[in-house]
Amino acid sequence: MFIVGLTGGIGSGKSAASQWFEKQGIQVVDADIVAREVVDVGQPALKEIATAFGDWVLQADGSLNRRALREHIFQSPESRHTLEAITHPIIRKSIIEQLNAATSPYVILVSPLLFETNQHELTDRNLLIDASEEIQIARASQRDGQSIQQIQKIIAAQMPRAEKQQRADDIVLNDGHLKHLYQQLIALHENYLNH
């Protein structure tokens, strides 16, 4: 199976790109969705997180208090490493299972941390959806309702844009309209079909 890693910073257009590929009949494995699934109520990772951090990470219904945990890990690199040590191996295993089950001509692995988590090791080619920091902040603040400061912290925690550009095999600049994004994706889709 030919696997294309798709990455980009917050607000870059990863979701728009992955949805376009899905409309072309290409299966998409989304690392963010997998990451949410592995910490659902009843999943072993959730129990490990509560043991490592304390019950404050749980809401009254037993689900993960994502916002509180996110704020905590952005303030504490040590806590972030603890969380990643618990979740990353479980996430990787689930991603591999989903990639292996794909039946489309190729499969897309969407991951905002494709390089940071070494998920690029699972791919044959890597596509960066790129946007300027100003565009990223504008899109993410409109979409998520987060403060500019919180979005800047997220951007700062991710691999620098220039490094992602160096590591990517293909780069799509998404500073404009969706029509322009889709035009660039059409050419890449044809290349990926002919891998």
From Swiss-Prot:
One Pfam match: CoaE
Top enzyme category: transferase
Subcellular location, record wording: Cytoplasm
Enzyme Commission number(s): 2.7.1.24
PROSITE patterns reported for this sequence: DPCK (PS51219)
GO cellular component, one term: cytoplasm
Residues annotated as domain DPCK: 3-195
GO MF terms, alphabetically ordered: ATP binding; dephospho-CoA kinase activity
Protein name per Swiss-Prot or TrEMBL: Dephospho-CoA kinase
